[in-house]
Amino acid sequence: MQLRLGEPPLTQAECALVYCFAPSGENATFSLPAEIASLDEKVWSGLVAEAAQEQKFQGKPNSSLALRLPGPIRKLVLVGLGDPAALTLEALRRATANGLRQAHSLKAKQVVLSLPDTGLDQVRAVQAVAEASLLVAHQDNRFKSPPKPEEERGFSVEEVTLLVPGLAQARQDYENALQRATEMAAGTILARELVAAPANVVTPPALAETARQLAQDYGLEVEILGREECQALGMGAFLGVAQASDLPPQFIHLTYKPKEGDPVAKLALVGKGLTFDSGGLNIKTDSRSIAMMKTDMGGAAAVLGAARALAALKPQVEVHFIVAATENMISGRALHPGDILTASNGKTIEVNNTDAEGRLTLADALVFAEKLGVDAIVDLATLTGACVIALGEEIAGLFTPDEKLAQELQQAANLSGEKIWRLPLEESYFEGLSSTVADMKNTGPRSGGSITAALFLKQFVEKTPWAHLDIAGPVWAEKDSGYTNKGATGYGVRTLVEWVLAREMAAASS
């Protein structure tokens, strides 16, 4: 999809997408935006107002009205924004996606989008609209047969022009917003396609090859450690999980460094990279659950997607992207329940459940990240079903002992529209991981499972500010919603990018 900028007025278009606010105040009635009301009176003889009244369109959130009309605008989509005082960037994204889905239903190819005065930061609003446009248009047909000549496939909208009041006065700011949106969307789409691909396509070596390609395309440093190199570093927890698979484990370390000048911050992003999780000898017995275990590398996908976006945006921040990639399989070499592993920080772990393997791989990845001397570490993992039970399928759980980092990530999530909710690191719960034969077990009691999982990870970070995002819920969507299509969501990419960019901005202003 092509994105362009333009200035009002809206005079001619194949398809126009117009935002409408709901009436506010007692006894207030809905009225069309002025530019559409004028065209309706002069050109359309009141057809739009009549249709809005008949369809009871009132500009409410999640509402829309799609019409075919005589020129100069042949297709018109009205989308509701609701109460202007309650408008958020995420509501604007969702309304944009809703409108573009309607434009698709009208088979529109070129859409002109008239951005009103939203009361929000207008540059941020342009970025939000552009993100939604690019993400809703993404359709993953890689594994389908080519369409027949008469078969329509893909999103019809090919070009979106954003009409922005006052464009000339701040054109470069708006162009920068489009670039940020474009790169964030590209990173999100990379993450979506990694998660959506089956485990016979996205293997540990395939993830490593993706990292190598990113390094080649964007000038990143890349280090891929195999089994022997990981053994030399004492990564017994990671390798214990990997030992049953016929595919080699791959420890991926990508680094972005600014081309000129010293970095203003040094950060690490760590992603869980289980390309398939059978559960090991504690095998997953639910067929639906095991079929979805191709998604267990959603954290790795988010980290690689963020690498793609940040390498293109070029912040003055050094960022390390770390993934311990493997499968969790069953074979004669498989990890047994009761086995004891030694992580690279010397701590020993009694494995009382081989299906709690992600935290074992993350343990060595977190130790590796801290040794880099970074200012902060954020890990993302499809870690626990308990977090999905607690927060549902749209919200990630945030765990951190660091108040500043918690606030930073919440602010980044507010900007991206990716929902997070902070959960407690209740230290007394760590008693549930106590072992009589090792320093700790890898799982505790059923209750508080997402908390004990986070407390387990905490044992592998000594002093560096650290946060853990449990993304087991939002990594996958069971239906179209807003700018997210059914399937892999690419969750986490935009929040990570916003966090890194905010760190850069904070350093520049201090």
From Swiss-Prot:
Pfam families: Peptidase_M17, Peptidase_M17_N
CDD domains referenced in this protein's UniProt entry, alphabetically: Peptidase_M17 (cd00433)
Keyword RNA-binding tagged: no
Subcellular location: Cytoplasm
Record GO biological process: proteolysis
GO molecular function terms noted in the UniProt entry: manganese ion binding; metalloaminopeptidase activity
Catalytic activity from the UniProt record: Release of an N-terminal amino acid, Xaa-|-Yaa-, in which Xaa is preferably Leu, but may be other amino acids including Pro although not Arg or Lys, and Yaa may be Pro. Amino acid amides and methyl esters are also readily hydrolyzed, but rates on arylamides are exceedingly low; Release of an N-terminal amino acid, preferentially leucine, but not glutamic or aspartic acids
SUPFAM superfamilies reported in the protein's UniProt record: Macro domain-like, Zn-dependent exopeptidases
Cofactor(s) of this protein: Mn(2+)
Cofactor descriptive note: Binds 2 manganese ions per subunit.
Binding positions for Mn(2+) 2 per the UniProt entry: K272, D277, D296, E357
Residues annotated as binding Mn(2+) 1: D277, D355, E357
Signal peptide segment: none
Gene Ontology terms: cellular component: cytoplasm
Residue numbers annotated as active site: K284, R359
Enzyme Commission (EC) number: 3.4.11.1, 3.4.11.10
UniProt keyword annotations, A-Z: Aminopeptidase, Cytoplasm, Hydrolase, Manganese, Metal-binding, Protease
Membrane-spanning segments: none
Highest taxon, organism lineage: Bacteria
Purpose of the protein: Presumably involved in the processing and regular turnover of intracellular proteins. Catalyzes the removal of unsubstituted N-terminal amino acids from various peptides.
Family: Belongs to the peptidase M17 family.
HAMAP family given in the database record: Cytosol_peptidase_M17 (MF_00181)
Protein name from the UniProt record: Probable cytosol aminopeptidase
Source organism of the structure: Synechococcus sp. (strain JA-3-3Ab)
Organism classification: Bacteria, Bacillati, Cyanobacteriota, Cyanophyceae, Synechococcales
